[in-house]
Every structure is written in C-alpha cells, then in structure tokens.
Amino acid sequence: MAKEDCIEMEGVVLEVLPNTMFRVELENGRIVTAHISGKMRKNYIRILTGDKVVVEITPYDLTKGRIKFRSK
C-alpha cells in the first residue's frame, strides 16, 4: 500500500502491551492498537505510558496502526 493512503494522527499511549504493541488514544477519542515502526525498533526508541506519539492508520482498518514518531 502506498504511504499517501495512510492517515496520520497524534495520540497518547494508554497502555503497553506484549510484543511491542501499545494501546493509543487518538485526538478524536478513538482508541487503537499500534505497533512500533521498523526504524524506531532498530534504534531502540523506548515508548512508555503517557508519551505523545504520531500514529499512521490505514483507511481499511481504523483499529490498528503504526507508531511513527514519539514526541518529547
């Protein structure tokens, strides 16, 4: 799938799940399950509860996403 099709939204990490999965609450109040992108995994970027993140969501499944960036 092309990257232009993805929807980017900001959110806050609510819960850390096993296998580098996270429960994220988006700006609009929707809760999604997200995993870390490959570059973040490669560079050992840690994500904790309460971190602000940017999540990419596909229009096909609005309940799953990929964490693209962690704000400070």
From Swiss-Prot:
It comes from the Bacteria. PANTHER family: TRANSLATION INITIATION FACTOR IF-1, CHLOROPLASTIC. This is Translation initiation factor IF-1. GO terms for cellular component: cytosol. PROSITE patterns: S1_IF1_TYPE (PS50832). Keywords: Cytoplasm, Initiation factor, Protein biosynthesis, RNA-binding, rRNA-binding. It comes from Francisella tularensis subsp. tularensis (strain WY96-3418). One of the essential components for the initiation of protein synthesis. Stabilizes the binding of IF-2 and IF-3 on the 30S subunit to which N-formylmethionyl-tRNA(fMet) subsequently binds. Helps modulate mRNA selection, yielding the 30S pre-initiation complex (PIC). Upon addition of the 50S ribosomal subunit IF-1, IF-2 and IF-3 are released leaving the mature 70S translation initiation complex. HAMAP family: IF_1. The lineage of its organism: Bacteria, Pseudomonadati, Pseudomonadota, Gammaproteobacteria, Thiotrichales. The gene is infA. It holds the Pfam family eIF-1a.
